[in-house]
Amino acid sequence: MRLINRLFLALLSCTLSVGVFAQTQDSTVVAAKDSVAPKKTKVFLEHANTLSFDKERNAEAQVLNGDVCFRHDSSYMYCDSAYFFEQTNSLEAFSNVRMEQGDTLFVYGNYLFYDGNTQIAYLRENVRMENGQVTLFTDSLNYERIPDIGYYFDGGLIVDSLNQLSSFYGQYSPSTKLAIFNDSVRLENEQFTLYSDTLHYNTDSKIATILGPSIIVSDSGTIYSSRGWYDTVNNTSLLLDRSQVVSGDRILTGDSIAYNRELGFGEAFGNMSLQDTAQHVMLEGQYGFYNEKSEYAFATDSARFLEFSQGDTLFLHGDTLKMTTVDSLYREVKAYY
C-alpha cells in the first residue's frame, strides 16, 4: 500500500538588491529588484488643524499639527504632526502614524517617511502591518506600494490564525499572500516548531516551502530536510534531497519522502533506508515505507536487510522485504522473491 500525496505548490522567488535610505540617519535596507517604477502622482494634504512654516528649521517644509491626513491615490496617511515637502512630493509623519490602503491593509508606527515619487513608505518604531488575519510586527519596515511588498531587515514576526514565524529578514506581499524569511527562521505551531535558514510561507494555504537546512521538532519525532514543503494544516509534507524522519530509535531516509505526521506514515523513494539504532538493524531498498504506529516496514527493488549487532554483519536479500515488530526485543523479517 502506498501513501501518495498529490499537492502542487507554485514556488515563488524574489530576487533582491540593496538600496540605501539615509533619511534621519536610517540603516541600509534591502529592496525588491523587480520593482516597477510607479507613475508619478501628487501627494495631497487633506487635513490639519494648524499649518505653519519654520524657515530656520526647514524652509521647504509645511509644518502640520493636529489630526493630519494625507492622500496619495487610494492610500491615506494619518498622524499627529508632520512635515510636508510639497516640492519633492514627500512627507515626514510623527506619532500615531497610520497608513490605510483600501479596506484590507493597515500599517501603524511611530514614524513615517513617505516618498510619493517612488511610492515607498519607511516606517519605524513599533510597526504593525495588518492584512486580514495576518499581522506583521517589527521596528523597521519599508513598504513598496508598487509591487505591494513590505520588508523588514532587523528582525520581525508574522502571525496568522495558525502559525507564528520570525526571522532576521523577512518580506510579505498582501496581494500574493507570500511571505519570505531569511536568517534565523523559526515557525511555531501548536504541534511542532520548524527551524530554518530560508523559508517561504503562504498565509492562505499555510504551506511552508523549505529552501535551506531545516529541522522540524515535535513530540512524535524530528525531521531533517533542506528542500521540500510542509502543509501545516494537514501535517503532510514532501521532503527532498536525502531528507530524514526520526521517530524514537528509527531513522527513515530517502531521496524523497512523503510523510504524514498525523498517521505516522513515511513513504521513501530512491535509496531508501530504515535504521533501528537500538536493535542495530537496517532495511534498504529503492522504495519503501514505515508505519510508526504499527512499527511495520516494507522495502522493495534491490531490497536487503542488515543486522550488525554482533560485530559481523548479516545480510538478507530479496525482491521484497517486510519487517514487523514482535516485541520490544525482536523483529521478524520476511523475504519474497
Predicted feature locations:
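Bacterial Sec-dependent N-terminal signal peptides
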Residues: 1-28
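N-terminal amphipathic/hydrophobic interface segments
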Residues: 23-337
